[in-house]
């Protein structure tokens, strides 16, 4: 057995790596599909379901505070809301930009967000259907992007961060709000989470690999209903 195994390996040293790679990619595709199906079915009740489980989104003021602070010395013409969902954050983003683009992979979510924007009389919002792994944006189209409680829903966060880097103008602002690492398994079933939050050091490493430098960050302690949250503001490194 050993000689034949060694001969086989030396004859094609990449075959096992290729097989592993195919398995990983297949797993990621399944995860993406699961997330898409989940959000397509919960669009109309997503906000109420989240509020029931976690309480109000009390980190939103912190997101707005950092966005305003980081935009003092830069002009934000176009701000993109990644995984915009039902559009709860869009009014806040609209106060800091001339145009807001909401992107989501679930058409049903965009329908809810569009209806709410029309009811609020928001004319500066545009909606685009597309995945976060392949953003419907031109290279450098956005001055800022906001990923609010989005990254824990994607199968491959680093892939998404690299795509964010592509869509941002050099020096553009990236604002990321997400859970700190936690052990609340119920989030997988009830909220469609693929990741139970993130380790701070691991996330910093991904941001650096994707081409970002962290400008500032804040934390919001967890409570009985909701895990801890961190909000990170980073810049797309100048090339």
Where are these regions (language model features)?
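N-terminal auxiliary segments of SAM/dcSAM-dependent transferases
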Residues: 1-37
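Conserved catalytic loop of SAM-dependent methyltransferase domains
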Residues: 41, 50, 54, 59-61, ...
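Conserved alpha-helix/loop element of class I SAM-dependent methyltransferases that forms part
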Residues: 54-76
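Class I SAM-dependent methyltransferase SAM/SAH-binding core
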Residues: 78-81, 85-134
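A short acidic, Gly/Pro-enriched loop at the edge of an enzyme's catalytic core
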Residues: 133-145
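A short SAM/SAH-binding and catalytic strip from SAM-dependent methyltransferases
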Residues: 143-156
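A short glycine-rich, Lys/Arg-flanked "PGG" loop and its adjoining helix->strand segment in the class I
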Residues: 158-173
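C-terminal alpha-helical "lid/dimerization" subdomain adjacent to the S-adenosyl-L-methionine
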Residues: 173-232
